[in-house]
Design a protein with these regions (language model features):
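Short acidic, glycine/proline-rich loop/turn micro-motifs
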Residues: 1, 58-59
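N-terminal Rossmann-like dinucleotide/flavin-binding domain of flavoprotein oxidoreductases
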Residues: 1-41, 172-198
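Rossmann-like dinucleotide/flavin-binding elements
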Residues: 26-37, 47-57, 63-175, 203, ...
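Short catalytic/ligand-gating loop segments at beta-alpha or beta-beta junctions
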Residues: 197-205
């Protein structure tokens, strides 16, 4: 996601720490309840996270091939066309809109696991000169302009994006108080059309039909639809009510509570349960 490249360093830090501490990591391994019981663990920490909420069965046409979750888009599993509708204007919806309109976004399928261990690798980020042009910050040191600001360069977005939410009111009102204005400014300057109070009627090969906040039926002619309508906890590994497993189970992170999940809360959950054990 543009602007979040620094989080890569956090991931790389944990990978190196796990290796340094001798933690055994098993990838591409399907885990089930029987495997956990057979292993005779004393504690099992379920940090299985979340999956994007699907609209299949809830919205006509949600199973069409041009419809995808934000995870499918960002992983590179699916790609979008030149016109895109984003369903959901929470934090993820804004992130996806920025990713779709910025020139320096990079899908995860371009990042092999070997790059995470390469100390010289850094995600492709916006250059300083590009940042100055976008935000109208002059590089002159004589401060001939007020506040060192000039008129920003006109931005030609790489695709047309519609960002929609069901509730009425300003989009992005629930974003972070210190940086939310940056995200709102980005989508505005990149020509993202913001739609509030939308009722999603159906998705067809023509695009997505909505009822706008004035009660009028409207067709948004888009090539692709990205669903950012929240996420759901993955808890299949937790014991059922009445089970008596040998291990003590702990549920943390998004698996514990999917709503409003962020990295800070997930890391804190992990630290607290580890300290308790």
């Amino acid at each position: 996601i543009p602007g979040k490249e620094e989080f890569f360093e956090t991931i790389r830090y944990y990978i190196n720490e796990l290796e340094h501490l001798g933690v055994e990591i098993k990838l591409n391994t399907k885990v089930d309840k029987a495997m956990l019981e057979k292993a005779k663990f004393h504690h099992v920490i379920v940090a299985t996270g979340v999956v994007p909420r699907s609209l299949a069965g809830k919205l006509e046409g949600a199973d069409l091939p041009q419809v995808m979750s934000y995870a499918e888009l960002l992983s590179g599993e699916k790609s979008v066309g030149d016109t895109v509708a984003v369903i959901g204007a929470g934090g993820i919806g804004f992130d996806v809109s920025e990713y779709l309109t910025a020139k320096h976004g990079q899908p995860l399928d371009e990042l092999g696991p070997e790059l995470l261990k390469d100390p010289s690798y850094r995600p492709k980020a916006q250059s300083v000169s590009e940042w100055r042009e976008e935000w109208g910050v002059t590089s002159d040191t004589d401060y001939q302009t007020e506040g060192g600001l000039i008129k920003p360069e006109a931005i030609k977005p790489i695709r047309q994006v519609y960002l929609m939410q069901r509730t009425k009111g300003r989009l992005g009102s629930g974003l972070n108080k210190t940086s939310g204005w940056v995200h709102r400014a980005h989508v505005k300057s990149h020509g993202v059309i913001q739609v509030s109070g939308a009722k999603y009627d159906k998705i067809t090969n023509e695009g997505i039909w909505i009822t706008n906040n004035q009660g009028q039926s409207q067709l948004l002619r888009v090539d692709s639809v990205v669903v950012c309508a929240g996420q759901e906890s993955v808890v299949e590994l937790m014991p059922n009510v009445g089970d008596a497993p040998d291990a003590q189970y702990h549920l943390i992170g998004g698996a514990k509570l999917a709503a409003e999940l962020d990295a800070k809360r997930a890391i804190r959950d992990g630290a607290e349960v580890a300290a308790a054990i």
